[in-house]
Amino acid sequence: MKVLRKGDRGDEVCQLQTLLNLCGYDVGKPDGIFGNNTFNQVVKFQKDNCLDSDGIVGKNTWAELFSKYSPPIPYKTIPMPTANKSRAAATPVMNAVENATGVRSQLLLTFASIESAFDYEIKAKTSSATGWFQFLTGTWKTMIENYGMKYGVLTDPTGALRKDPRISALMGAELIKENMNILRPVLKREPTDTDLYLAHFFGPGAARRFLTTGQNELAATHFPKEAQANPSIFYNKDGSPKTIQEVYNLMDGKVAAHRK
């Protein structure tokens, strides 16, 4: 973990503040700013634990914080699937993840089926996408930074934990919740599984624009970058461009094929 000092800002400071709060040292709502209150609570924690009370969060302070931290929903309470590449074996995992996150297990099963056919060890040949939910390295790093401590995952510098189906499913659920929160106010309704898959596939920003563009507009005109990367989605076999509605119907059919 990074050495932190008063005046620092960023995700690591948020993690520090979260840990301090969980250990009983009240810094208020984590804001990512290492200010006076955070400094004072760090010093207090260090004094209480016989550490150098200089307010600098180095290796020893991080280690002591982590040793005292007990996550509310540790990922190890989620069962491992009894087999790989199996929807039936994945179902108890997703049911437990639903209980932990509030995201419907049916939705999680649909996405894992589309992305990896329930192969939690799979890695894409053309990108860094890995595991049940095919997380890219950068996205995974962000998810672990934002949600890892909630489930007892403190760090994963190599991204190896993407192949742990329990953690992949938990992070997949948290990403789905993020996308729900982005799409809901724009759509003024609950997003469907197809809406959410669009956000997963194209990114939430592009999905938001896609879902608010006229149905008869040519999709490639509005999304040239996505069309270039995914020509079979945006163009018919004869080369003619598809409309927004036609692309949506295609994606909806893909999602429907994995609903059970």
Swiss-Prot record:
E.C. no: 4.2.2.n1
Keyword Endoplasmic reticulum: no
Catalytic activity: Exolytic cleavage of the (1->4)-beta-glycosidic linkage between N-acetylmuramic acid (MurNAc) and N-acetylglucosamine (GlcNAc) residues in peptidoglycan, from either the reducing or the non-reducing ends of the peptidoglycan chains, with concomitant formation of a 1,6-anhydrobond in the MurNAc residue
Effect listed in the UniProt record for changing residue 197 to F: 49% loss of enzymatic activity
Residues of the site described as Important for the enzymatic reaction: 147, 178, 197
GO BP annotations, alphabetical order: defense response to bacterium; viral release from host cell by cytolysis
Molecular function in Gene Ontology: peptidoglycan lytic transglycosylase activity
Region Peptidoglycan hydrolase activity: start-end pairs: 106-210
Domain of life where this protein originates: Viruses
pH-activity profile: Optimum pH is 6.2.
Catalytic-site annotation from UniProt: 115
Family label: Belongs to the glycosyl hydrolase 23 family.
Described purpose of this protein according to its UniProt entry: Endolysin with transglycosylase activity that degrades host peptidoglycans and participates in the sequential events which lead to the programmed host cell lysis releasing the mature viral particles. Binds and cleaves peptidoglycans found in Gram-negative bacteria and that contain the A1 chemotype peptidoglycan and fully N-acetylated glucosamine.
Record remark on domains: The N-terminus is responsible for primary binding to the peptidoglycan. The C-terminus contains the peptidoglycan hydrolase activity.
Name listed for the protein in its UniProt record: Endolysin gp144
Gene giving rise to this polypeptide: PHIKZ144
